[in-house]
Amino acid sequence: MNTNTLLLENKKAKFNYFIEEKVSCGIVLKGTEVKSIKAKKLSFNNSFASIKKEEFWLENLHVSKYKEGNIFNHDELRPRKLLIKKQELQRLKKFKEKEGYTLIPISFYLKKSIIKVEVGICKGKKLYDKREILKQKSIKKDLSREIKYK
């Protein structure tokens, strides 16, 4: 039985980046943030992971305020600390130092009722790569349409 339940997925990341490798890590959240994420009220736009002072942080992730929350509601764009082993952090740091690589959140999922983040080690796609993918998708769609109506 699979105990991982996908909450949200960053579909734009797969289109805009080549994902070299994925790393799973925990995230430090406040109570209202947990409720908002479980209600799927978050946006991945322009979010990225960074390494500051030997700590792993998730930046620019927009988690909407919980509508039932009161004055103790969270700040929507605050940086959130990611929990990862030190060895893994050192390995990610080496990737980050290479030119062209960035760390992007790929998905949020539940593992035994704990929210986890999957961070991808990504390299940006060029415009011609994106066009090629769109061209291949349209060809596949046309072929399936022709097969369906024959």
Curated annotation (Swiss-Prot):
The keyword Cytoplasm applies. The keyword Kinase does not apply. Pfam families: SmpB. SUPFAM superfamilies: Small protein B (SmpB). It is found in: Cytoplasm. It comes from the Bacteria. One of its GO terms (biological process) is trans-translation. GO terms for cellular component: cytosol. InterPro entries: SmpB, SsrA-bd_prot, SsrA-bd_prot_CS. Gene3D superfamilies: 2.40.280.10. One of its GO terms (molecular function) is RNA binding. Keywords: Cytoplasm, RNA-binding. Belongs to the SmpB family. Required for rescue of stalled ribosomes mediated by trans-translation. Binds to transfer-messenger RNA (tmRNA), required for stable association of tmRNA with ribosomes. tmRNA and SmpB together mimic tRNA shape, replacing the anticodon stem-loop with SmpB. tmRNA is encoded by the ssrA gene; the 2 termini fold to resemble tRNA(Ala) and it encodes a 'tag peptide', a short internal open reading frame. During trans-translation Ala-aminoacylated tmRNA acts like a tRNA, entering the A-site of stalled ribosomes, displacing the stalled mRNA. This is SsrA-binding protein.
